[in-house]
Amino acid sequence: MNRKMIKTIVLAALMAVPFFAKAQTFAGITAEQNAQNTPEGWAAVNLPQLPAITSANTFNIKDYGASTSAADNTKAIQKALDAVPSTGGMVVIPAGTWIFGSTDQMTSKTEVLSIKAKTILHLCAGATLKLVEYGKAPNTKTVFIGGKNKGKNVTDVVIEGEGETSVIDGQGARWWLARENGETFNPGAMIRFEQGKRFLLRNFKIQNTPGVNITISNSGKASHATIHDVTISEPSSEAGKGKASHNTDGISIWGPYVNIYNCNISNGDDNVVCDNDAQYIHVWNCYFGTGHGASIGSFTENIKHVWFDNINMNGTTAGIRMKTGINSDGTLRGGGEEDWKFSNFTMTNVKNPFSIDCFYDKNYNSNPAVDKANARALDSTTPTYTDILLQNVKTTDVCAGNAIFLVGRPESHIKNVTLDNVQISAKKGIDIRFVDNLVFKNNSKITVSNGSIWLKKFDSTWDDQCGATSTGSTITDTKGPFTLNSKTLTDKKAGSFSNGFAISNEKGKSYDVGSGTTYIKYSANQYTIIIPDGVKITKMDIEGRNNYSDADAYIGEINGTSYDADTYIFPKDKSVKNYTVEFNSPVKHTLTFTPKVKQCILQFTLYTDTSTGIKNITTIAQSTNNNVYDLSGRVVKSNAKAEDLKSLNKGIYVFNNKKYVTK
């Protein structure tokens, strides 16, 4: 062998070494150990247990036939993954674009690329693992990367990159359009591990997935996952036909012990969602762009101990979103939900900042009295939401939806929801049904730009400790009576009155005056009378008539109590009726009523508890001026002057149609 040939061989060998040393060195898990951030009282999330990575257990997909010019590299990549020994190793995806995912190239029935235990899948900088186009890839819940592996646990797996130029691309645009066109398919998650433990996903980008991006566990069978510095990017579900992505959940969790931090997620469904058996889930220091927010459900059975902290949202459809669904057979998807904390949230351009829906999706009745009358029997699937804390949450602008929307179930109320230092500004107010102990504290404030703060309060209790829901109206007369009619109505659109009261309704209807009367028109709808702070109503007079002549009308609900058609009826002959409603205990904050009619015209007179100990007051029929009467209607002094009242015994007297008290 001559000297020139030896030099050529040595140079070739040296050229191969730096690539491995720089791009293929496994960084270990020291950074993750230092970033654990385990909440007090929780067990730490376990990290993968892996061997030392050397050239002997590192496998480059190019060595198994993969090529950037190939139409599909599924078999070549799988051969590299299969080459990893039972003791563990690393598979390297070099820089370049690598097409994979054709159904006819799969070697497994459940995964396109199947990863076994103690494997590191490493995407180099500039590497793109790209799914084949729609029509060539499997579309029936097949996992694209990971382990479905029924009956087989997969442990100690790492999928990692070298930053945002390490990309997994699902080419989802054609899939999303197919869904809009009514084509039937059900794509699996891009990355999914159903069974096993100790998973680590870090430092790469997923974009344009056909469906869910990352799924951890199935029925609690997988646990202990750490996901950090992962970017997820799909269009919003509201981007419009041909542009929107659909059902592209960011990270979906179905098992215990998961840490997620330093992630940037924008998509077309839940940014991060906890479903059945998600427990001890800690999400922190994340940015959520488009998507449906920090979500729970709609499968919520056995979800416990979830903490989202330091979340910055911009353009998210929902902020904090909790929901329990109803199956097609009518059974529920809940049971055992408890202990959530959402802290240090900043929301910008977020439509619905805080919602819980136990009738997901919108299976509740517009009149909650109907839902209450149809309460179902409790069973193991009934949702039991309890102990929910929002702390240091604020919106930076006006949200387009409801400030707060909480709908429990009549047979199982949402319990113990605390808003601690929460400031929300929204176009629409608060709607709560079947909620026990909603607490506002520590500088919390709800501001509404359109209508009243309280839209609906049905079969619910709350405690506003800091004036969070105060309307800001001040009234000097807290005793009343207070009349709500056209004479005291100051704003038809807002439904506000000169005496500090207001009336709101779900449909945003304005308040018009009945022709030739002082009555206000009310259509079939539930209305909420907003009572000023410090006022407690003990009695209400209702005066008015039907505004149509084709059928009788009536008020079917007052303050959460349902009434039949004969109790507070307004006949079709349009005769004026007067009714008095007395409340068993003083009503404060809000009072609801629901007309059942095309349209009634009504006025309300509200009374507070001003009891003097006098059981009955006799109406005085006499009209003679300058006489003084006692409360029995007897003349105690004729042709009197005002100064004559001073000579009377202690008591209450009527003089010239005014009441006087002599002490």
Language-model features: where?
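Short beta-strands within extracellular/lumenal beta-sheet-rich domains
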Residues: 513-534, 576-580, 599-601
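Short, surface-exposed beta-strand/strand-loop-strand elements in extracellular ectodomains
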Residues: 546-562
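N-terminal targeting leaders for non-cytosolic proteins
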Residues: 470-523
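Right-handed parallel beta-helix
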Residues: 125-126, 155-166, 197-208, 221-238, ...
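Extracellular "leader-to-stem" segments immediately downstream of a signal peptide or signal-anchor
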Residues: 2-117, 127-202, 218, 223, ...
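Extracellular beta-rich repeat passengers
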Residues: 319-470
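C-terminal outer-membrane/trafficking sorting elements
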Residues: 611-663
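Short glycine/acidic-rich loop motifs that flank beta-strands on beta-rich extracellular proteins
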Residues: 102-103, 131-134, 171-174, 179, ...
